[in-house]
Every structure is written in structure tokens, then in C-alpha cells.
UniProtKB/Swiss-Prot annotation:
It is found in: Secreted; Host nucleus. Residues 1-19 form the signal peptide. Transmembrane segments: none annotated. Belongs to the RxLR effector family. The keyword Transmembrane does not apply. Secreted effector that completely suppresses the host cell death induced by cell death-inducing proteins. The RxLR-dEER motif acts to carry the protein into the host cell cytoplasm through binding to cell surface phosphatidylinositol-3-phosphate. It comes from the Eukaryota. Keywords: Glycoprotein, Host nucleus, Secreted, Signal, Virulence. It comes from Plasmopara viticola. Glycans are attached at N120. One of its GO terms (cellular component) is host cell nucleus. This is Secreted RxLR effector protein 69.
Length: 141
């Protein structure tokens, strides 16, 4: 390595150190980096009291709420699926769909999207049940 290269690198390092110390002094921070990190860690460990609250980042809250909503939709779709497939309580499921103002087509899409799909035979059977239910109980809306 040439001596001019060494001098250039050494000069750049001195300027960098000088710039950092000047910036720290201008910000009125006289502490070294280890002491600053120690203070940051100690401040993070303090327990907040009273009206102060520990706030989670928005992305964390959003993803947790999304997972919760997804789980609820999955459970609801699973319940719909098994009541419609098993010839039990399908009238209750149809009444629930009516109160939520959902059609059978939208309910089948909801179940297929959030749980699993139906075979064509099962869809035909459910449509026949729904038609019979609809004849007995006209749509309230």
C-alpha cells in the first residue's frame, strides 16, 4: 500500500471522528455511546404507571386483530359447513343467514373461502333444502 493512500485513509478517519464529536457536542450530549445505550436500556425497563400506557406498534396490533378475525371467520364457516352437510339444524342456519341478510350463494362462497368447498352433489342437496325452507318461510326483507 502506498504511503499517500495510508495518509488519505487516516485523514478521513480523523475527520469522521471529529465530525461525530462535534455533532454530539452541538446536541449537548456529552455521554459516550456505552453510557447512552445503558440509559436507553434502563428507560425501556421502567414500568409506566397512571395514565401512561405501553403502546404496541400499529403493525403488531393490526396483525393480531387480523389473525383473530380470520380465526372467527374460520370457526363460523366451519359451523355453517357442518350444519349444512349433516342434515341437522339446517333451518337454524338458514334463519341465521336471514338475520344477517345473507343469501345462500354468498354463504356458500363464505364457507368455501374460509373453510372448504362443497361437492356438486352436496350443493344441490343444500339448495333443495334451502328452497323448501324458503317456501315455508318467505324472506323477511
Amino acid at each position: 500500500m502506498h504511503s499517500s493512500t495510508i495518509l488519505f485513509v487516516l485523514g478521513a478517519a480523523i475527520l469522521a471522528v471529529n465530525g461525530v464529536t462535534t455533532a454530539l457536542i452541538d446536541d449537548e450530549v456529552d455521554k459516550g455511546t456505552q453510557e447512552k445505550h445503558r440509559l436507553l436500556r434502563s428507560n425501556l425497563m421502567k414500568h409506566e404507571t397512571g395514565e401512561e400506557r405501553f403502546e404496541l406498534p400499529a403493525w403488531f396490533i393490526g396483525s393480531k386483530a387480523y389473525k383473530q378475525r380470520k380465526r372467527e371467520r374460520y370457526e363460523q364457516a366451519k359451523r355453517y359447513y357442518y350444519t349444512l352437510v349433516q342434515d341437522k339444524n339446517h333451518d337454524e342456519t338458514f334463519r341465521e343467514l336471514d338475520t344477517k341478510r345473507k343469501t345462500l350463494k354468498s354463504a356458500l362462497k363464505f364457507i368455501a373461502w374460509n373453510y372448504k368447498g362443497f361437492s356438486n352433489y352436496t350443493k344441490r342437496r343444500i339448495r333443495k333444502k334451502y328452497t323448501a325452507y324458503r317456501i315455508k318461510n318467505p324472506r323477511p326483507w
